[in-house]
Amino acid sequence: MVKSFYGYVRDAWKNPDETYVNELRWERLQVWRKQGSVTRIERPTRIDRARSLGYKAKQGIVVVRVNVRRGGLGHVRPNRGRRTQKMGKNKVSGGMSIQRIAEVRADRRYPNLEVLNSYWVGEDGKHKWFEVILVDPHHPVIKSDKNLNWVCDPSSRGRATRGKTSAGRKGRGMATRGKGTEKTRPSIRAYKSRGK
């Protein structure tokens, strides 16, 4: 079977440090650092990944690039008396992943659009960059698209903020089932955040 163009692009992005993507990324990051936190772009950087997540080159679909800080929640060690359990040094779980933060920021910048999905495009020592696919639920082209018109339903409002995207479901523990996930359903909050 003949591999498609998208297959070659996907292979190049699997190991970006070892392929031509590394040189392109070095040039791109210099430009991206000077741009704002949420930047609308003309076309996706990773066309294979965007299309697999639902992107189509048609009216009503917008792609934005978002940069977010890197790293976990650094916690300063208390210098006064504490119980070891209350120091919070061993593990501080973030409420949202870096990718979810990027999706929510894009959602707030474009309140009339809904987040479809997002994917990683680059990182340096300080920031991570994600591209977020946004859909206009009121656009007639989207309403007539049989693959995307589910976004027009009122139940799909605020997908990013409610954790209904792919990254959001993963962060809420909905990506796994069975043994070991007892504290993630019906929700993280219902189990007093013990599922994090």
From Swiss-Prot:
Belongs to the eukaryotic ribosomal protein eL15 family. SUPFAM superfamilies: Ribosomal proteins S24e, L23 and L15e (SSF54189). One of its GO terms (molecular function) is RNA binding. InterPro entries: Rbsml_eL15_core_dom_sf, Ribosomal_eL15, Ribosomal_eL15_arc, Ribosomal_eL15_CS, Ribosomal_uL23/eL15/eS24_sf. Residues 159-172 have a biased composition (Basic residues). SMART domains: Ribosomal_L15e. GO terms for biological process: cytoplasmic translation. This is Large ribosomal subunit protein eL15. One of its GO terms (cellular component) is cytosolic large ribosomal subunit. Residues 153-196 are annotated as: Disordered. It comes from the Archaea. Keywords: Ribonucleoprotein, Ribosomal protein.
